């Protein structure tokens, strides 16, 4: 009931049956629709907001069954915890001007996911760590906006992401078998990445009266918003992080180096490779006309709305560092 619990929601849709029941249910033999229903899906979801704590929690569970081969895909739970933007250094009782560190804001999003694909008669025989795909991810962006020389808005941002895995897969090439082989280590594995950016923008205003309409009360307002941003991140395929490795694949006399991540294919993707050092330039234009109508009321009409152009330069790129305009 939304009125009884305005900060929480619950929903459920259940359509579940074991494959053995489907095969032995006499009623289904005479029900062509039931017999032709190859997939059954069930879902349950719950969410709750805590406005005073700037916190929200949502959780769901999903089951998808394929009756023909008795396979089942289960995700339980898939839970997200979100902390909306807070200013941890802001004083409760401010005196005087706002301090620079009071502008720093923090957000948090955490997600836990646990899933498996198996046969329905084997579901409860599976090991939680070895057979289920599970993990947790934390995302923490920290940012602030400052005014520089009265006219420039400066926004530094730092993004931090951390993943928790329960397995690490080392790969190699087996010459005798002629295929890739895996060596899996189970336990707690922590993987993180980070990036930083700095954005600067300002606004330039222009007002003028059209030369061809001097007798009418018409004004044109032109707003130009130039911006420049810098973003950087290290190469997380580097050996100093320990997230990636490589092996030599020797097949049909052709030797190739294969790079891979120990944590590829899991519920949360590992950090991407490649060093980043991007400088971006952008100009946005807005043009509007203000005039008096027949009733002497002032009206505004947008002539150009957010006409933008931009270009970027990747300082870490060896080939084609400039983007298209």
What is the role of each PLM region?
Residues 1-325:
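Outer-membrane beta-barrel proteins and related beta-barrel translocases across Gram-negative bacteria
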């Amino acid at each position: 009931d939304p009125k009884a619990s305005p900060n929480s929601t619950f929903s459920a849709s259940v359509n579940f049956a074991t494959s053995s029941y489907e095969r032995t249910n006499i009623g289904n033999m005479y029900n062509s629709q039931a017999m032709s229903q190859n997939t059954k899906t069930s879902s349950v979801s719950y969410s709750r907001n805590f406005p005073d704590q700037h916190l929200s929690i949502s959780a769901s569970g999903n089951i998808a069954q394929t009756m023909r081969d008795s396979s089942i895909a289960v995700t339980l739970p898939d839970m997200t915890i979100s902390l909306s933007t807070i200013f941890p250094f802001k004083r409760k009782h401010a005196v005087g001007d706002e301090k620079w560190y009071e502008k720093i804001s923090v957000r948090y999003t955490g997600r836990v996911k646990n899933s498996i694909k198996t046969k329905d008669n084997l579901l409860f025989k599976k090991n939680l760590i070895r057979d289920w795909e599970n993990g947790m991810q934390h995302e923490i962006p920290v940012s602030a906006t400052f005014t520089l020389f009265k006219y420039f808005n400066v926004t530094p941002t730092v993004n931090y992401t951390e993943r928790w895995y329960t397995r690490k897969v080392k790969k190699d090439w087996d010459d005798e078998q002629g295929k890739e082989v895996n060596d899996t280590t189970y336990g707690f594995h922590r993987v993180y990445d980070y990036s930083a950016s700095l954005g600067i923008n300002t606004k330039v205003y222009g007002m003028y009266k059209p030369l061809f309409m001097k007798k009418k009360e018409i004004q044109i307002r032109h707003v130009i918003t130039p911006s420049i941003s810098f973003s950087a991140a290290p190469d997380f395929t580097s050996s100093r992080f320990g997230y990636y490795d490589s092996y030599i694949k020797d097949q049909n006399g052709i030797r190739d180096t294969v790079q891979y991540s120990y944590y590829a294919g899991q519920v949360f993707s590992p950090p991407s490779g490649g060093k980043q050092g991007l400088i971006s330039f952008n100009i946005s234009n807005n043009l509007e006309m203000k005039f008096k109508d027949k009733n002497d009321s002032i009206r505004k009409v947008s002539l150009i709305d957010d006409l933008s152009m931009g270009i970027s330069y990747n300082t870490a790129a060896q080939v084609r560092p400039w983007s298209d305009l």
